[in-house]
Amino acid sequence: MTALVLGVGRMGTAIAYAMDKLGFHVIGIDTNREAANNMPKKVNLEDGKTPANEFFVIDDVNDLNKAISYHKHIVDVVISSLPYHQTEAVAHHCIRHGLRYCDLGGRVDVSESINNLAKEIATKPVFTDLGLAPGWVNILAEEGYQSLYGGSQITNVNMMVGGLPDYSLSSENPLRYCISWSPDGLINEYKDDCIVLEDGQIKTVKGMDGLESVESDKLGKLEAFYTSGGASHSIHSMKARGVNNCSYKTLRYKGHGAMVKFLMRDCQLDDETLNKIFVEGCGHCEKDEVIVIAKVEKDNKTWKEEKLVKSDDRFSAMQKATAFPISTVASLMAEGYFDDRTVQNRGGDKKLPLVLSYADVPHDEFNKRLETLGIYN
């Protein structure tokens, strides 16, 4: 089977590695010549191989769709880790040409556009928002929901994710933070409004509000607050199923939230200054870790799961926690698992739609493949 990976930067490289390890022939395409040329150097495989079997550099972004069309007869799944501004057109092209498609997502308007078209004309499964948050944490929350489903109504679904410096390095700056992904994206998530489900009603809250203390089984005392993007369609999905409360929060070491909130709101620093604080003041992570927590409650029953991913000699924790989940789902898509399939889901038979949701992911197989990729090593 063949996987076409669009965008071979940090995340695309990790996706290519994962798909190769899952037994796929991997074709990598990028519009950035430097990224494509550096890709083989980013992953030190034991046998000297590169993480993708073929590389193509497209100098003109408008030629991306031509490249996809050229490979469409041999490709079993297309995985996009392209920037937001390139994703929509590429996804529409894949849908119109009957290709299985998935992406890291994160932009609500772009994902809505892709899914709306897929509902109208898709002939193969389409799955957006499949990174870490949104992505893995939402799948984990669905696992909890389905574990407790039946009898009385589920009341609360809480999702939390933290990309953190390794604890041994967590006191190197006052914010107790390091950059493991886009600082611009981080600032947007802190500043943008968020949607939550509260007492059965969808509400809008400010990013960085809702500060609470969290006792992690793996990392001890942390804090959490609302940030945008990570919930994806889980809020609306849980409301439709009668859940009272559902939210997504970001996890940080204690003290981070109050300090950043002071800089953003009280000092009213502009984005350029905030970017400089994060990049130059905190710096990029030498060693990082990602913690993923999902908690589901009903009556006196609680389902809670924590996952901890650490960086290794090959990838950062953020790369593994973002790229390995989408690769796992993409491998199932490529194998035809979601094609015209009826499964027993939440107590009854259900034909899987072509626009897939987190509830459609088979949790046992998903978790098994994550372990095959060595996500916890």
Label every model-predicted segment:
Residues 59-72:
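Conserved Rossmann-fold cofactor-binding substructure of NAD(P)-dependent oxidoreductases
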Residues 83, 93-111:
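ADP-ribose/adenylate-binding Rossmann-like module
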